[in-house]
């Protein structure tokens, strides 16, 4: 699927590179790194396996495969695209931390604060929810994926009630780490769009994603969903820059 598509694209872009597909569960580890079938070792990997799950992976003999993999990376036995540091951004409470620091007016520069104010919905830790004003808030699991367990709640004083919930058809197929905490964001009403998909014309909502390389924007992606809370039902939308 996605992994093989990326492999083929890399082969096209870098035909001189020896690019191979290897399932994480077929991977072997030795003191030198990750051995391949011809006796060589992998020097650069593109990781798609979710980091929050990888760290707990074990072999059939109950050896800590994930920990051994990360130890080898720390020893510079191989390099990684999408490295372990990415786990910081995968935890949704990171947005709560950024917004909390923004509110102090002591941590970010003026340009940083302008970017946060424009692009980050006000975000809060679970422990701060009781002190927020009454209104609508989005509740998200900190390790949630594909809209799983996303709810919109109506806060009334010290209590809250369900206003909207994301119902996921393929709940059991969504692989993610169990979350013991949630975070909250202000509910911001989205604009509605009409889009033609494979089954006809639908009314729904757009989600834009910006991919960064360092501090530079490298690409923009767009998804369309008939639902306000997008999940696996969303369609990828082609973008045209005029």
Predicted regions and their residues:
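Domain-scale recognition of functional cores that engage charged ligands
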Residues: 1-242
């Amino acid at each position: 699927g996605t992994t093989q598509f990326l492999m083929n694209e890399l082969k096209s872009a870098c035909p001189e590179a020896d690019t191979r597909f290897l399932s994480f569960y077929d991977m072997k580890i030795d003191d030198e790194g990750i051995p391949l079938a011809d006796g060589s070792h992998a020097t650069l990997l593109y990781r798609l396996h979710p980091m929050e799950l990888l760290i707990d992976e074990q072999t059939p003999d109950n050896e800590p495969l994930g920990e051994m993999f990360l130890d080898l990376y720390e020893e510079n036995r191989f390099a990684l695209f999408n490295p372990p540091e990415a786990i910081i951004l995968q935890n949704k409470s990171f947005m709560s931390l950024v917004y909390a620091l923004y509110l102090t007016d002591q941590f970010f520069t003026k340009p940083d604060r302008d970017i946060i104010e424009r692009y980050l919905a006000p975000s809060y830790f679970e422990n701060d929810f009781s002190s927020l004003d009454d209104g609508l808030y989005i509740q998200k699991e900190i390790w949630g994926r594909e809209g799983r367990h996303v709810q919109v709640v109506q806060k009334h004083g010290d209590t809250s009630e369900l206003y909207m919930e994301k119902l996921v058809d393929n709940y059991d197929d969504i692989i993610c780490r169990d979350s013991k905490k949630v975070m909250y964001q202000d509910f911001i009403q989205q604009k509605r769009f009409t889009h033609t998909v494979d089954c006809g014309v639908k009314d729904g909502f757009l989600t834009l994603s910006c991919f960064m390389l360092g501090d530079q924007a490298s690409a923009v992606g767009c998804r369309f969903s008939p639902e306000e809370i997008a999940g696996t039902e969303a369609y990828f939308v082609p973008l045209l820059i005029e």
